[in-house]
Amino acid sequence: MLILPEITKFMNKFLLWLIAILLVLVAAVAIIWGKELSTLSSLHSVGDNPYLYEMQYKAAYDLDDMIAKEVDTNSELLDYVIKRIGKGIPIKMKSSQVADENGELETIHCTSFQARNAEGEGYLFGRNYDYFKNPTLVTVSRPKKGYASIAVTDMSHVGYGLDKLPTSFMKKVNALAAIYAPVDGINEKGVCMSIMALPHQASQQDTPKPDVGTSAIIRLVLDRCATVQEALDLIASVDVRHDATVGSGYHYMIADAQGDCVVVEFDREDGWKTMLVRKPAGQNAFAVTNHLLSPKYFTTEPDIYVGNPNSHSWWRYETICAFLDEHNGILTTEQAQEGLAKVRWVDLALPNGRVEDTQYSNVYDQSALTLRLRNWNDYDTICKFSLNK
């Protein structure tokens, strides 16, 4: 039978061992997930808006590894993120971007343009992201091997929704996938890139080159390219493959700080070869919506073969081009937002019964390296982000 002093001695040793084990576990977690934990701790809502978030991405991400593994579909991307970031933790991620019963995606009706900045040197890049009312995440990343950037992600693509927000630590974990899933952004060299949907135009490039998916190509450009030409060289070095199960393809606008601007499309009739539509020399502005601009396919009237008539793409294209022409392609930041306001959606009823809105409107300053974001058609509130902090 143990006497009291021996019991006390035993308990003291037990507590010391328990503390030691806990310290080892804490140290292990810090070593394995330190950068991820730091990233998640930086995730916060912007102002009083419960549906707009900002995150400083401090964890490592290996784009070369992603390319080597040829991650291209949404499910492959989520699996890749789970294995790489989760490190064994059973993270659940599911994108809301899926086709309807007709195998189509009738949404994401976006507008992008570049215009000369009337308030100083350089150019502005305007962007409407028209989709459903989902939470939005602005991610600032400063990789050791790559350019710093501000990128915007529709949080529904990484498993969030109005009823699932990153309000607790465990609910924040999915946000780590956002680094691979931007839909537009700007890097420290002033390169901007955005994505617009094109029904029936899901690129399936298939050559010996490595595969890169829909949004990952934007991350690659932001991290690695200082000019439009560098971006085009990068795109030419890979196969851009869009997830066919989503029911939509895409085209991209890329613009740099020197005023070069191009729309990148893919030719469904010729092995999905890349087609380029450049801003004409001497022109101050250039715009794109949700139909093909390549001369081989371009039409002035709605045509289901080259775009989605339900998105009012041709009307939006004519409207934004007329606005840019009215100002000779030279805009202030407020005029850029005014142009976006002319083609935004408020409670747009779709043929499938769903209702779409402009999720956010962005104006990037390609010289000042700033983003002015208006969320959910709240034009009275401007949320500002900068790479110069």
For each feature predicted by the language model, list its residue ranges.
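Non-transmembrane alpha-helical segments in soluble domains
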Residues: 219-222, 232-235, 321
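Extended amphipathic alpha-helical segments with heptad-repeat/coiled-coil character used for oligomerization
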Residues: 246-299
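Short, Lys/Arg-enriched N-terminal segments with co-localized hydrophobic residues
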Residues: 1-10
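N-terminal mature-domain region immediately after signal-peptide cleavage
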Residues: 12-226, 240-241, 325-389
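Secretory/export targeting leaders with adjacent low-complexity proregions
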Residues: 233-244, 252
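A recognition module on extended beta-rich or small alphabeta surfaces enriched in W/G with H and D/E
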Residues: 148-159, 179, 285-307
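Long, charge-rich alpha-helical interaction segments
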Residues: 301-337
